Amino acid sequence: AELADAGVQMAVNGIGGISDLESRLSVYRLLNEMGFHTPTMIHPTAFIEDSADFADGAQVFPLAYVGTQVKVGYGCIINTGAIVSHDCILSPYANLSPGATLAGGVSVGESTLIGMRVTINLYVKVGKRARIGNGATVKADVPDGGVVPAGTIWPPRQ
């Protein structure tokens, strides 16, 4: 409240939310209620194609790549070295961990966590509040709330 009273108009949410997404979301709610603008923050070493579209509050870390026609929702994190290929859609609060790779046309649902070094194949849809463990390979759609264990291939073999 003191910052807002002093005329500060912008704020950045520094809560990552890997283990406690609700903390990250509550900080965004608080910042919005207090009237702060949460700008998109893009590290100078990230490579962003001109046609990529960012909502406010998104954060892009060093050496990340965001391809053509990508849509990045409010409060998303694209962490260090992550690759978001052409035509992907990241819904609000999606969190891509370091080294995650999304092939073209991937859709990531709201408040979903994509772990480190995850690979998601072309045109896969990952549902809301899903959790994809580190090093997983995702070859088919993941439902809302789905969990893909670390180091596995989705879908599991029958």
Which residues are covered by each model-predicted region?
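Glycine-rich hexapeptide-repeat left-handed beta-helix
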Residues: T80, S91-P92, S97-Q158
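Phosphate-bearing ligand-interacting subdomains
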Residues: A1-H43, F47
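Conserved acidic residues
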Residues: Q9, D56, E110
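Hydrophobic, well-structured mid-protein blocks that either form specific transmembrane helices
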Residues: V27-V84
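Glycine/Thr-rich phosphate-binding loops of Rossmann-like dinucleotide-binding domains
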Residues: L21-E22, T68, A140, P156
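Short secondary-structure transition/capping segments
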Residues: I18-V27, F54-V60, V84-S97
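Residue-level signal for short amphipathic helical patches enriched in basic/charged
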Residues: I18, G67, S85, A103, ...
